[in-house]
Amino acid sequence: MATEQTAITRATFDEVILPVYAPADFIPVKGKGSRVWDQQGKEYIDFAGGIAVTALGHCHPALVEALKSQGETLWHTSNVFTNEPALRLGRKLIDATFAERVLFMNSGTEANETAFKLARHYACVRHSPFKTKIIAFHNAFHGRSLFTVSVGGQPKYSDGFGPKPADIIHVPFNDLHAVKAVMDDHTCAVVVEPIQGEGGVQAATPEFLKGLRDLCDEHQALLVFDEVQCGMGRTGDLFAYMHYGVTPDILTSAKALGGGFPVSAMLTTQEIASAFHVGSHGSTYGGNPLACAVAGAAFDIINTPEVLQGIHTKRQQFVQHLQAIDEQFDIFSDIRGMGLLIGAELKPKYKGRARDFLYAGAEAGVMVLNAGADVMRFAPSLVVEEADIHEGMQRFAQAVGKVVA
C-alpha cells in the first residue's frame, strides 16, 4: 500500500539536519546544463557549480548515460575486489599526468587525508621517524577531518575540537621567505593549493611554487598540491600544476573529478606510493564502480582541447561583465583567479557583505558563491554557454544594483 509522502520544505532542514549549514531559502529540484529550477519552478543560472563540482553542468547526457549503464551492471564491490571502471579511470589519470599510481577515495577531505598520511609515512620509513613537520599556509582549506582541518590554515574551522595533530606549521601564502624560515630537514611535506579557493581565490605566483619545489628538493620533503578545487580543467589546463610548470610529488583531486558524483583521487609516483603496503590505508567505498564510471565519462570530455581552450574565452567574458559592473557600481577592488575560478574582492565600503550580494543574486535568479566575507566567487560549468554567461551576469548586475542602492 502506497504511503503519501510528507511535504518537504526549507523548514524540514531545520527539523532534521544538524545545524552545520545555512542553506538558501529555496530548494533546487531540477538542473539542466547551467540552469536550475526550485520547488516553485523559479529558474536560476548557476555560476556556483556546487562549489566547483558540476564542471559539465547539470545532468550532462554523457554522465547520465554512464551512471545509468553502470547502475544496471555493478554498483559496489569494496576493495576486497577491484573493478573495471576504477582501473580505466586510474589509467586515464596516470596517462595524462606526472603520476604513476593513484588511490581513489570519496571526497576532497579523504584524498587530502590520504596524501598527508602518505607524506608522513614516507618520511618516517624512508628517512627518520622525526621527519614529521608539515608546512601549510594561512587561509588554506584542505577538508574537515581533524587532520585536514588542522593542516588548513583557518582557526575558525579547526578550533574547539580539543588537541590537534602536532607538528603542523602555518605561514603566509605566497611568502617564500616565511617558508624558508621554518623549513628544515624535519619537514616531511609542504602542502599548498595552487589557487586558494576558500581563502579568497588567491593564485600562487610562479616564483612561489618554483621556490617551494626547490626547497622541498633541498630538504628531501614532498611537495603536495591540493587541486581539489582548482584541478580537472578549472584553470584551463587539466591540472593547475601544468600551467605553472611545477610538478608536485603528490596531487589530490575531487569536486569536478566526478562532475557531481562523489569521488576523489590521490596521485603520486611509484617510489612514494611504495611506502604504503596492504592495510596502510583504505576505504570501503573508494573507487566504487558507479563513481568511477561517471568520473571516467567526465574525464573524457574535460580533457579535450575543445573544452580546455574554451575556458580562457569564457573567463574573459566573465571578467568583462565584472569590469562593467564595477564601472557602474564601483564595488570591486580586485578581479582575480585563473580560468573559471574567479574571485571579485569587494571594496572596503562593502567589507563583510559578500553574502548580501550572494542572497541578492539568488533573488535575481543567479547562483554565485562567496570566498570569505569580502570576495565573490564564480565557479561555473566549464562548458557554460555564452548566452548563459551574458544573461546570468545581467541578473547579477541587477542584484548588485539592489544591494548598493
Swiss-Prot record:
GO molecular function, one term: identical protein binding
Superkingdom: Bacteria
Entry-annotated residues carrying N6-(pyridoxal phosphate)lysine: K255
One Gene Ontology term from the biological process aspect of the record: lysine biosynthetic process via diaminopimelate
Gene Ontology cellular-component annotations: cytoplasm
Pathway the protein takes part in: Amino-acid biosynthesis; L-arginine biosynthesis; N(2)-acetyl-L-ornithine from L-glutamate: step 4/4; Amino-acid biosynthesis; L-lysine biosynthesis via DAP pathway; LL-2,6-diaminopimelate from (S)-tetrahydrodipicolinate (succinylase route): step 2/3
UniProt keyword Transmembrane, yes or no: no
Swiss-Prot/TrEMBL cofactor(s): pyridoxal 5'-phosphate
EC number of this enzyme: 2.6.1.11, 2.6.1.17
Designated name of the protein: Acetylornithine/succinyldiaminopimelate aminotransferase
Source organism: Salmonella typhimurium (strain LT2 / SGSC1412 / ATCC 700720)
